[in-house]
């Protein structure tokens, strides 16, 4: 699959409104329709099935891309990058995982947009290393929980994010002086589309563009990783984890012991092993 094969290759700033109207005209898929296409692609490699999955989800990419408008980057480019992420997700989507494509694809869409933002945010190249990128998209979440950092809190955040304390301090100082982009209004076009020619850069310490991005990304990203990790476990381990941790009506060790005809201690051991495997699987995704 290549971007040249589908309408997403035609996204430009001038034609963005028309593009959005076009992608919104593609019908959304029911769960059964989606699974049928996904199985045809996954098991038979049918390109037309891939096309159907992609076209029906282009509107979702536009929705996600709008959440990144605070960076002052062209919306058409954000959509274009998100479409690349969608195509990668469709290529990797396994219909047997048990989640809808939209839940699986959100991680890939946002990952591509993240890379674009980090490569092209013109005002401040805030994150260049892997550790800095992790901090860039996660530090604000920690700051909202902890407030201003003292030395002990820096150690806590560094441990949570798997980086050095000095890197936390450096990124905190960068984010404290984050730049904001301001564009002069276009008198001929009062739409809310993002201008591609910012004319003034001002420092605004109250600006928090990373907050909006983090809020939209974190939950979907975590849920997607959990679903993929669960799928890596055997059927019994999956059931134990779901019954003990994810179901609304959580089962006791004794409940599961009676179900599987083993002791409660054996279920506890299986649960412990499953959680260990789950943690390792999440870390690898």
From Swiss-Prot:
Cellular component terms per the entry's GO annotation: cytoplasm
Cell compartment(s), UniProt: Cytoplasm
Gene3D superfamilies: 1.20.120.1810, 1.20.140.160
InterPro entries, sorted: RNA_pol_sigma-70_dom, RNA_pol_sigma70, RNA_pol_sigma70_r1_2, RNA_pol_sigma70_r2, RNA_pol_sigma70_r4, RNA_pol_sigma_r2, RNA_pol_sigma_r3/r4-like, RNA_pol_sigma_RpoH_proteobac
UniProt-annotated stretches for the region Sigma-70 factor domain-4: 229-280
A molecular function (GO) term: DNA binding
DNA-binding region: 253-272
Keyword DNA repair listed: no
The family this protein is said to belong to: Belongs to the sigma-70 factor family. RpoH subfamily.
Function noted in UniProt: Sigma factors are initiation factors that promote the attachment of RNA polymerase to specific initiation sites and are then released. This sigma factor is involved in regulation of expression of heat shock genes.
Subunit structure: Interacts with the RNA polymerase core enzyme.
NCBIfam families cross-referenced by the UniProt entry: PRK06596.1, rpoH_proteo, sigma70-ECF
HAMAP family: Sigma70_RpoH
Protein name in the entry: RNA polymerase sigma factor RpoH
Source species of the chain: Vibrio vulnificus (strain CMCP6)
């Amino acid at each position: 699959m290549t971007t040249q094969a589908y309408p997403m290759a035609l996204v430009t700033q001038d034609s963005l409104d028309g593009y959005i109207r076009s992608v919104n005209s593609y019908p959304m898929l029911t769960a059964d329709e989606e699974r049928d296409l996904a199985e045809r692609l996954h098991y038979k490699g049918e390109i037309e099935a891939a096309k159907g999955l992609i076209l029906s989800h282009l509107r979702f990419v536009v929705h996600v891309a709008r959440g990144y408008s605070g960076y002052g980057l062209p919306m058409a480019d954000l959509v274009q990058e998100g479409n690349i992420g969608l195509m990668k997700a469709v290529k990797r989507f396994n219909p047997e995982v048990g989640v809808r494509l939209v839940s699986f694809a959100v991680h890939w869409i946002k990952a591509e947009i993240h890379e674009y933002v980090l490569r092209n945010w013109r005002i401040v190249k805030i994150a260049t290393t892997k550790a800095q990128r992790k901090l860039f998209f996660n530090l604000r979440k920690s700051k909202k929980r902890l407030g201003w950092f003292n030395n002990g809190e820096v150690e806590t955040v560094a441990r949570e994010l798997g980086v050095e304390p000095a890197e936390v301090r450096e990124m905190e100082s960068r984010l404290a002086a984050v730049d904001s982009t301001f564009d002069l209004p276009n008198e001929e076009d009062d739409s809310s589309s993002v201008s591609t020619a910012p004319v003034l850069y001002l420092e605004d310490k109250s600006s928090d563009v990373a907050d909006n991005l983090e809020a939209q990304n974190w939950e979907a990203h975590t849920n997607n990783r959990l679903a993929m990790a669960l799928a890596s476990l055997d059927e019994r381990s999956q059931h134990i984890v779901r019954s003990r941790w994810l179901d609304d009506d959580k089962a006791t060790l004794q409940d599961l012991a009676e179900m599987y005809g083993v002791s409660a201690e054996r279920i506890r051991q299986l649960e412990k092993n499953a959680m260990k495997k789950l943690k390792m699987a999440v870390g690898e995704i």
